[in-house]
């Protein structure tokens, strides 16, 4: 078997070749290729004339030997037009009911059925068996169907509670396509002279029958780690608890997990990673409402839980809370304390400075810097006599901010613990302390916890960086996940600097 990274590179080049000349269809091609390489079915929803059939035709060129069958369903379509006409010779000579399947669905590797919901019950029932069991009953015999990819298309969804729901449930990947939107792409499409029937894939990239069969075994060997399973189960529980969530059968979950295994395998990994779960957004929706719902739920999962983002923020919140507790304890110990005076009949308490304060000026540190009079202040210098007068009689108090300039009016008070508290214009306050008593350093306990948390963040970011190279995931998702991780990292760094 090829080295995993070489295989991933080959599949990437194969997809690029298939995408040539198709504008704004890269994601659809890649998911159809993934479906073809893992033997799954795709439903394309969109208006006529947006290259749905061309996507299916292109996928034939992914293989060295692949026969294609395509058919436009109508209300009058018959099984003979899809599965082959009856053999008149066999019926006449031997009385056998047998179809001539050459050139029809039972002998095709790539199948495209347009306007699928117009098919009648006879076609639908046979098609269900073909998809489920990859077998076709031809008269008295069961014939194996080589179908690797079924692409069904329509410009509408099946009606709810109709006989079509069973077939719709078999369409694992569901893609909602629209017209070309970008101006430059629209122009390129208009002037393109590419022949749609040309094979754009070099022979060296095409998949042989032997490779395809071996890969089916290899896909099944891809592991599902416990943390990834927990994410899947969390998503399932979230959907079960939402009133408007689509019903997802156990069969559909199981088939979706195999698709995730295929995504991991063709990305060069030996285990399903959280990044692969984004594919579920194209597997679990039923209609427009549930499509938006799946997008929202997966975004919550990917940006909040897949790489422990929310768990790390919760831990950070606990660390910050503990730090505040320690700071409060330290603040109580180091805050400058005045002496309460006055008899029991005094109208208001008054205070005096401690006897050890004897200098004509007194500089006190803010335990937490504040912005006062448009200045970031870390200490205030008071005239001792002015401070004593304020402590005794109240009124206005002034001090030099950071010890410079003219003395400025301060919003200051004595709290219940007899500490001096200064407040800014928003009434945020901090206690004052004598120089040499304020504790500036972060407690060792908090430092260690923040270091451990930052190391855990680095590990999660490294995991994401190693896993993000997935051909089948749109780059927009990678950007949102990276932003969520960077936000967590920034909050941790800010906490370390405080």
Swiss-Prot record:
Protein's name in the database: Regulatory ATPase RavA
This protein's record includes keyword Chaperone: yes
Annotated catalysed reactions: ATP + H2O = ADP + phosphate + H(+)
Activity regulation, short description: ATPase activity is stimulated by ViaA.
Cited function: Component of the RavA-ViaA chaperone complex, which may act on the membrane to optimize the function of some of the respiratory chains. RavA functions as an ATPase.
Keyword terms, alphabetized: ATP-binding, Chaperone, Cytoplasm, Hydrolase, Nucleotide-binding
Pfam family, one: AAA_lid_8
Subunit record text: Homohexamer. Interacts with ViaA.
Enzyme class: hydrolase
Subcellular location: Cytoplasm
InterPro entries xrefs: AAA+_ATPase, ATPase_RavA, ATPase_RavA_C, MoxR, P-loop_NTPase, RavA-like_AAA_lid, RavA_ATPases, RavA_LARA_dom
Annotated binding of ADP, by residue: 23, 49-54, 196
A single MF term (Gene Ontology): ATP hydrolysis activity
Organism: Salmonella newport (strain SL254)
